[in-house]
Regions:
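Extended, subdomain-level signal for the structured scaffold at the beginning of enzyme domains
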Residues: 1-99
Length: 104
């Protein structure tokens, strides 16, 4: 049995849902994969089309990841100015094997 491979999708308000759900569909099928949806605040998060993701974890509560994925979206500019989000990206990326983004 393969060891656990933690995939973290670091999302933010107005993320494009397809930029998250498309890669999730593929990466969740990796042997031993455990996908985590996380944001700075956790809880619920609204994507750019109004779709609401529930039970989003707080990035600060995620200890580590093997792959960090940052989806694109209409909230990208605001996300790039969010010091807390960028700090969590840096923290998780420091020990991740892969750091990826989608579209943006």
């Amino acid at each position: 049995m393969a060891s656990e491979f933690v995939v973290v999708f670091a999302v933010y308000p107005r993320v494009t849902q397809l930029d998250f759900t498309g890669p999730h569909e593929v990466l969740s099928r990796l042997p031993g994969a455990r996908c985590v949806l996380a944001s700075v605040q956790g809880g619920e998060l609204e994507a750019d089309g109004g779709l609401v993701f529930a039970h989003v974890r707080r990035l600060a509560d995620v200890e580590r990841c093997d792959l960090l994925c940052v989806p694109g979206g209409f909230g990208t500019i605001e996300a790039m100015e969010d010091a807390a989000l960028l700090a969590e990206h840096r923290r998780l990326a420091a020990s991740a094997r892969y750091v990826t983004s989608v579209c943006t």
